[in-house]
Amino acid sequence: MEYSSLTLDDFLSRFQLLRPQINRETLNHRQAAVLIPIVRRPQPGLLLTQRSIHLRKHAGQVAFPGGAVDDTDTSVIAAALREAEEEVAIPPSSVEVIGVLPPVDSVTGYQVTPVVGIIPPDLPYHASEDEVSAVFEMPLAQALHLGRYHPLDIYRRGDSHRVWLSWYEHYFVWGMTAGIIRELALQIGVKP
């Protein structure tokens, strides 16, 4: 498949046909979730944020909207939708959730569940000034091109940990965000 011409219908068909196996073992027990917002267009986009430089953790990094599951959340999906509304003003009612990817462990001790959702193209995004410094859209076909990601092995506390690095325009996409995008690409059958 030529991913430069990936349509929303192609993406949805491939995601639904190749359902994720979510029984993956994780080390962390604290729950968090992120929303992977796919912008509904003939050539879909991937909505990303750049975190505020004033945050204590992951300052200035490119990320999906998301955060810890709290006591008011009924599920990880509810947490992802709540965080997306808090961070970039995406109303939960405007998100068509199509599924989740397997949870991943974060270096900060969370088990993070990526929630994949389709959002309308005309939403007036409004970044929460406390948490987000920028909101931008990357063409989904470009985001899912595995050749754009480069591995880097980091050693932490005696263990090797592989992270992925990439650039989009002037944004440095790496770490968990790049790993989740790669997982989404692999999930729909993109070959390395």
UniProtKB/Swiss-Prot annotation:
Motif Nudix box, chain ranges: 67-89
A Pfam family matched in the record: NUDIX
Top-level division of the source organism's lineage: Bacteria
EC top class, as a word: hydrolase
Annotated keywords: Hydrolase, Magnesium, Manganese, Metal-binding
GO biological process: nucleoside diphosphate metabolic process
HAMAP family xrefs: Nudix_NudL
Family: Belongs to the Nudix hydrolase family. PCD1 subfamily.
Function: Probably mediates the hydrolysis of some nucleoside diphosphate derivatives.
Family annotation (PANTHER family): MITOCHONDRIAL COENZYME A DIPHOSPHATASE NUDT8 (PTHR12992:SF11), NUDIX HYDROLASE (PTHR12992)
Protein name: Uncharacterized Nudix hydrolase NudL
The organism of origin for this protein: Escherichia fergusonii (strain ATCC 35469 / DSM 13698 / CCUG 18766 / IAM 14443 / JCM 21226 / LMG 7866 / NBRC 102419 / NCTC 12128 / CDC 0568-73)
Lineage of the organism: Bacteria, Pseudomonadati, Pseudomonadota, Gammaproteobacteria, Enterobacterales
